[in-house]
Amino acid sequence: MNLLDKLNFPEDLKKLNEEDYKVLSSEIRKFLIDSVSKTGGHLASNLGVVELTLSLFKAFSFDKDKIVWDVGHQSYIYKILTGRKEGFKKLRKYDGISGFPKRNESKYDYFDTGHSSTSISAALGIARARDLKKEKYNVISVIGDGALTGGMAIEALNDVGFRKTKLIIILNDNQMSISTNVGGLSRYLNKLRIAPVYNKLKTDIHASLDNSNLGKNIAGKISKVKDSIKQLIVPSMFFENMGVKYIGPIDGHDIDAMTEVFIKAKEINEPVIIHILTQKGKGYALAEESPSKYHAVGAFNLESGESNASPKNSYSKAFGKALVNLGAQDEKIVAITAAMPEGTGLKCFSQKFRDRFFDVGIAEEHAVTLAAGMASNGLKPVFAVYSTFLQRAFDQVLHDVCIQNLPVVFAIDRAGIVGEDGETHQGINDLSYLSMIPNIHIVVPKCLEEVDVLLKWAINKNAPVAIRYPKGGNIIDTLSPIKEVVEGQWEIVNRGSKVCIIATGRMVQHAMIAKEFLYEKGLNPTVINATFVKPIDKKLLENIKKEGYNILTIEDNIIKGGLGSAVKDYLSEIDYKGTIRSLGYDDEFIPQGNVEILYKTYKLDYENISKIVMKLYD
């Protein structure tokens, strides 16, 4: 039995000596690599915070102290040592433990996270509640250097420093978010890595002055110019100028050094930020060499590092290829990402058209208004973003793009169910919140071969357009892409009788699988591809009414405000008397799990579609 096998809860760690912690660090890394290679998950970021997490357990008592992990994907070690080690067999699986902190999972998880840059705000709220209730415990925010580039984190720092609330902020600096960090704040942190020269000089000066009478007499005068000296040696005092005491940088793989600083930080009655330097992917050579590749992985082969899933084309790749081709034809096309060039398929564009590629860091709000400014001055911006992250910029989409009717294209990746990352990452709301905004058009490819023709139409529309597509690739490869895009016109994929299935996006593929199943039973429903969710095809709906069809709408989105709502609203206007059913998600959050399992659970699989269609034939 190894050491890790004997440890389950924080109190178990109190018995360990210095050598034990070194052994434990190695065992945890092995456990992580073995476990994540089977289940998939966030690997590189967790490998980088092993010693940091152990130091937190040494310095704090999480039966009373409270910690908020920014994003939360780096909380695996914390979970392992708070009673959830066995749960890693079902990490990110349906009914298994989450890959992010969850209050309903453990008493040690104090705040749910999943999106970036929220931890300082949340921790500050917890700390201020503590103070108002006159309670005594420490509140810690752990935030990465990538997340610190997010505007919300800077807003929170501004508030922290103004009121001087006692709060410990740990900056986990691995020079990465998902991809390499960008921007002015990232450059600033690079400069801070040489700041120990200032700290050593300050210590030497104080020691010299304290050892002489003259020094003691002039110490007060020296302190008046201390800040000026500090500014000369450290390029910027960003944190301290905001009212937050800065300590660091500190080796993020030295448990003793971090523990000592954390213990001292507990005695500081004002906000403090502790700058920790870590290596993303530490302990697994392949992840050290390619931390972005191993940031989030599916199940993989330990020796080769290659994914166990068979490689196939994806919507992200199809989008990236299409944008490169269009960019070669039109120099006005520019691409924008919020720190995710690889995940959104923009890597190739960034290499081929460096001057027309803009990575703004974790800053979706800024990205959208940047795109609006570009569009107002004659460019054709395409902002590639995951569905779950676009919702962070809702106001900018409405206020800065759509009110002015500016030609910005939103390439919405990971739309619909994404699976294992759970509630915080499912992309099931975009059709609803975008449909309510005037001026915007929403198009959805039924297969990845349609991405290029719809993207070309979107870029040339001269109005706001959202093109929405899911994670992964095709389910079936028998569908022919549309050749021409006509605004607001839907495609009849299969002509049948009595029942009409109106589906959008990947759900068209589900509908066609169901159609084949039904055909064997002597039923032949019409299947319509709702290429446009906004505007809808009113003429076709009027024809469906005249022909007396019953209708089933299907979407990988919440039903309220989506395709089903739009169809029902219009049919009500034209006094439709038939039966209409809608499939999608009800008023709830969708948990983690395999995509196919989730589709089946929420009745979006072909078997359930077939059952509903058969009832509509009765």
Swiss-Prot record:
SUPFAM superfamilies: Thiamin diphosphate-binding fold (THDP-binding) (SSF52518), TK C-terminal domain-like (SSF52922). Its EC number is 2.2.1.7. Keywords: Isoprene biosynthesis, Magnesium, Metal-binding, Thiamine biosynthesis, Thiamine pyrophosphate, Transferase. GO terms for molecular function: 1-deoxy-D-xylulose-5-phosphate synthase activity; magnesium ion binding; thiamine pyrophosphate binding. Its cofactor is Mg(2+); thiamine diphosphate. One of its GO terms (biological process) is isopentenyl diphosphate biosynthetic process, methylerythritol 4-phosphate pathway. Mg(2+) binds at residues 145, 174. It comes from the Bacteria. Thiamine diphosphate binds at residues 73, 114-116, 146-147, 174, 284, 364. Binds 1 Mg(2+) ion per subunit. Binds 1 thiamine pyrophosphate per subunit. SMART domains: Transket_pyr. It catalyses: D-glyceraldehyde 3-phosphate + pyruvate + H(+) = 1-deoxy-D-xylulose 5-phosphate + CO2. One of its GO terms (cellular component) is cytosol. Gene3D superfamilies: 3.40.50.920, 3.40.50.970. Pathway: Metabolic intermediate biosynthesis; 1-deoxy-D-xylulose 5-phosphate biosynthesis; 1-deoxy-D-xylulose 5-phosphate from D-glyceraldehyde 3-phosphate and pyruvate: step 1/1. Belongs to the transketolase family. DXPS subfamily. Catalyzes the acyloin condensation reaction between C atoms 2 and 3 of pyruvate and glyceraldehyde 3-phosphate to yield 1-deoxy-D-xylulose-5-phosphate (DXP). Homodimer. This is 1-deoxy-D-xylulose-5-phosphate synthase. The lineage of its organism: Bacteria, Bacillati, Bacillota, Clostridia, Eubacteriales. The gene is dxs.
